Amino acid sequence: RKVRERIFIETKKALLASAVVSTRRKDLHKQLGLKLDRSLANKQKKPREVSLSSGLFSQALGTLASPKASQFLRGLPGEQVMSIEYKGEIGVDAGGLFNDTLTALCDELFSGELNLFLETPNTKAKSRRNLDTFVPNPSLNDPVSMNAFRAVGRLIALSVRSQQYNTFKLAPNVWDMLTSVDLTND
């Protein structure tokens, strides 16, 4: 963990790009499509369960959680792996809609609109380090929530593969668990 801060970002990006290239599936030609309704998402005002939400993440959940994981392995580093279309809006997704949508999905996940993630005690108390970070809600272990967490993982993968470095405000110990780093008391 202590070495992690000393590795230059360009080195990290090169390693990630190498991993994307080596795991790329060349036989996948069909791009996933995502159709969203911004007006429906804007009507939501209170934090809700994923199954009751009309937000963008809940609308995207079916597409993000249902395809086989291999569908997300198409493309080279920086290529968009999914096309985005918004209901009632005219636009060609040449990358901008994709980038904006990934950012909006991340923002929604950590805004309090959904109950998938909870603020860390440090965030609540506004003290010490790792402020503004979140942990998965441990009380959510039903099938719909587990599907939503799977979709979050795929959203992280989409961000890495397309080199859209979005802000997933997960606490450092959550990242450590996701990357199989031994946990410490730091």
Feature names for model-found ranges:
Residues 145-152, 157-186:
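Extended amphipathic alpha-helical bundle segments that form the ordered cores
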Residues 89-92, 141, 156:
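Conserved beta-strand elements of beta-rich interaction domains across eukaryotes
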Residues 8, 106, 110, 135, ...:
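Alpha-helical repeat scaffolds in large eukaryotic proteins
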Residues 95-96, 114-121, 136-137, 164-170, ...:
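Intrinsically disordered, low-complexity regions enriched in proline, serine, glycine
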Residues 130-142:
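Aromatic/His-enriched, Gly/Pro-containing loop or helix-boundary segments
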Residues 1-131:
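Extended low-complexity, proline/serine/acidic/glycine-rich cytosolic segments
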